């Protein structure tokens, strides 16, 4: 799928930034798994001077998804996230998607 529709804001992109990108097929959790496998030691999240690698993020997502599954969250369920923009939010977001559930954002 190409995202190539003319958009005014692209005039403000830094030089060399592509205006068209190829969006791969697959889910976000599948993409995270692939990236974690290819680049396990690369930083995925930097937050207040602390780094989380892609391997660490993937591990946290899988463990949180397992916890959600244990309490009964399943495909199609809606899960509200009321969290600040912090690493824990990223983990929760991907864990919900990993189960096939739907994230319902309620950012404070």
Which residue ranges define each predicted feature?
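Anion (oxyanion) recognition and catalysis
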Residues: 97
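Conserved AMP-binding/adenylate-forming core of the ANL superfamily
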Residues: 22-24, 31-33, 41-94
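Structured binding elements
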Residues: 100
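Flexible, non-catalytic linker and terminal segments flanking ANL/adenylate-forming cores
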Residues: 1-25
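Short beta->alpha connector loops at strand-helix junctions that form conserved
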Residues: 106-108
